[in-house]
Amino acid sequence: YDNNTMLNASIVSESGRAGISVFGQSRHRSGYDHDGDGFTELPVISSQSVGMRSFFRTGAYSRITAQYHHIDEYRRGGDLLKQPPHEAFVAEQTDHAIDGGSLSFDISSADRSNRFNAYASFQNTARKSYYGSKQDLDAYGTTHDLTLAAGMQYVHAFRKLLFMPSELTL
């Protein structure tokens, strides 16, 4: 079977100055063995994800935006799916936990000829895996990655620079 359940909701204030959107998903799929040989052609999947995005207008031409998401996913293929992977003849198994988010501030002049953006974001990934055969205890692995990014951008729009409209981005 393959069961996929989703949820989405959004709300914006009457003034339009603030809003939030949330989502969630849960998926469960059984492993599929097409030819009956005891080995899956499609792996077991169990995943859940949740997240949100919100904004707040700090002025007529400025806003703060925040975003966050979490994903948790387990996959297992091979044979003997109810046993630990090192007890199977062939097994591929991954278990991920991923968190990410961002925060940004945008401001512009009334005519949008001057725009400024500052942002920061992150993603944290934790992964446990097994890729092995013949009951190999050394086929387990783990990975942990943290990614950070931050920056600023300024854009000035010229109605005419030399002979045509242009934008300068710094």
Regions found by a protein language model. Give the residues of each.
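Outer-membrane beta-barrel pore domains and translocons
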Residues: 1-2, 12, 25-27, 69-71, ...
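Outer-membrane beta-barrel translocator/receptor signature
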Residues: 1-35, 43-50, 61
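Hydrophobic, lipid-facing positions within transmembrane beta-strands of outer-membrane proteins
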Residues: 3-9, 18, 48-52, 97-103, ...
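One face of beta-strands
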Residues: 7, 22, 75-79, 148-150, ...
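Transmembrane beta-barrel domains of outer membrane proteins
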Residues: 8-14, 23, 53-57, 104-110, ...
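Short loop/turn motifs that connect adjacent beta-strands in outer-membrane beta-barrel proteins
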Residues: 14-18, 60-63, 108-115, 158-167
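Membrane-embedded beta-strand positions of outer-membrane beta-barrel proteins
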Residues: 20-24, 52-54, 66-68, 116-120, ...
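Flexible loop and strand-edge segments within Gram-negative outer membrane beta-barrel domains
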Residues: 29-49, 57, 61-116, 122-145
